[in-house]
Swiss-Prot record:
Keywords: ATP-binding, Kinase, Nucleotide-binding, Nucleus, Serine/threonine-protein kinase, Transferase
Active site as annotated: 164 (proton acceptor)
SUPFAM superfamilies in UniProt: Protein kinase-like (PK-like) (SSF56112)
Reaction catalyzed: L-seryl-[protein] + ATP = O-phospho-L-seryl-[protein] + ADP + H(+); L-threonyl-[protein] + ATP = O-phospho-L-threonyl-[protein] + ADP + H(+)
EC category name: transferase
Entry EC number(s): 2.7.11.1
Name listed for the protein in its UniProt record: Serine/threonine-protein kinase PDIK1L
Pfam families on file: Pkinase (PF00069)
Protein kinase domain span: 8-334
Tissue specificity comment: Expressed in liver, kidney, pancreas, spleen, thymus and prostate.
Gene3D superfamilies xrefs: Phosphorylase Kinase, domain 1, Transferase(Phosphotransferase) domain 1
Length: 341
């Protein structure tokens, strides 16, 4: 990428995940900072995750301040580099699509295939790191709730179901902070498990409702998964559930220790004896279970408590959609100054 595509200079590695490495980079012409994610296409699962992210982000025709923006995606094979576009007839692109669909490598495995995603650079880490390194702050909580609900409404309006909402996948941008009064900007990221709901039926031009787009692949991160996701039959209402877990945990600073990474993470759960169980899993076993919200007295008022309970309803039909959620959070934030003590 550095030699074949001199548009960017890589500065340093800032993150490494299960299927890619993220670098801080600069655009040579403007010196603007960007994030560049390098994904090696050596396994079908890597290719599928990368294509899902590309399809979701490239399907968005307008930008949203709280959704990560894809500047461009570069496909590299050995020394050959080309810009990737959705629906391209390029043989390299079609080989990746075939690999994703068939679940087996559809190109010469001796060739080095890479995808380079050029996106917004976020300098403040993720939501998990940001909140847990600071004392609880009502103003920050309010700002984050409004930003996240706005992002989710935007994604659902664009027929995108995220399917892996969690604090680790929400990035923090502090570049706009020119005064101490401003809260950082959140950006929903990591669309590797996302699903773009395409139109079907008699009128393919009519936008499909993400709340009527049923999916069957159980995916996500267990502590944020809705009960119907565990069951394998769900819609975009699963994103509402995940956001409910995040907001509840943020307001009350509920955390757990990840057994694999030993990292402290924001996330609410149910206690069963000495064990902690994901809320969605517990509700699948007992849909009538009453969640103890709030855990701490006076941590939220009745309207906030009721909204979180609805977001975490065992029956997805009892949850608000993303547009109602955004409206109700705005009302709580601005019409009821005593939502949190």
């Amino acid at each position: 990428m550095v030699s074949s595509q001199p548009k960017y200079d890589l500065i340093r590695e800032v993150g490494r995940g299960s299927y890619g490495v993220v670098y801080e980079a600069v655009i040579r012409k403007t010196s603007a900072r960007v994030a560049v994610k390098k994904i090696r296409c050596h396994a079908p699962e890597n290719v599928e995750l990368a294509l899902r992210e590309f399809w979701a982000l490239s399907s968005i025709k307008s930008q949203h301040p709280n959704v990560i923006h894809l500047e461009e995606c570069i496909l590299q094979k050995d020394g050959m580099v080309q810009k990737m576009s959705h629906g391209s007839n390029s043989s390299l692109y079609l080989q990746l699509v075939e690999t994703s669909l068939k679940g087996e490598i559809a190109f010469d495995p001796r060739s080095a295939y890479y995808l380079w995603f050029v996106m917004d650079f976020c300098d403040g880490g993720d939501m998990n790191e940001y909140l847990l390194s600071r004392k609880p702050n009502r103003k920050t909580n309010t700002s984050f709730m409004l930003q996240l609900s706005s992002a989710l409404a935007f994604l659902h309006k664009n027929q995108i179901i995220h399917r892996d909402l969690k604090p680790d996948n929400i990035l923090i941008s502090q570049t706009r902070l020119d005064t101490s009064d401003l809260e950082p900007t959140l950006k929903v990221a990591d669309f590797g498990l996302s699903k773009v709901c395409s139109a079907s039926g008699q009128n393919p031009e009519e936008p499909v409702s993400v709340n009527k787009c049923f999916l069957s692949t159980a995916c996500g991160t267990d502590f944020y998964m809705a009960p119907e996701v565990w069951e394998g039959h769900y819609t975009a209402k699963a994103d509402i559930f995940a956001l409910g877990i995040i907001i509840w945990a943020m307001l009350e600073r509920i955390t757990f220790i990840d057994t694999e990474t030993k990292k402290e993470l924001l996330g609410s759960y149910v206690k069963q004896g000495t064990e902690i169980v994901p809320v969605g899993e517990a509700l699948l076993e007992n849909p009538k279970m009453e969640l103890l919200i709030p855990v701490k007295k006076k941590s939220m008022n009745g309207r906030m408590k009721q909204l979180i309970k609805e977001m975490l309803a065992a029956n997805p039909q009892d949850r608000p959609d993303a547009f109602e959620l955004e409206l109700r959070l705005v009302q709580i934030a601005f019409k009821d100054s005593s939502w949190e003590t």
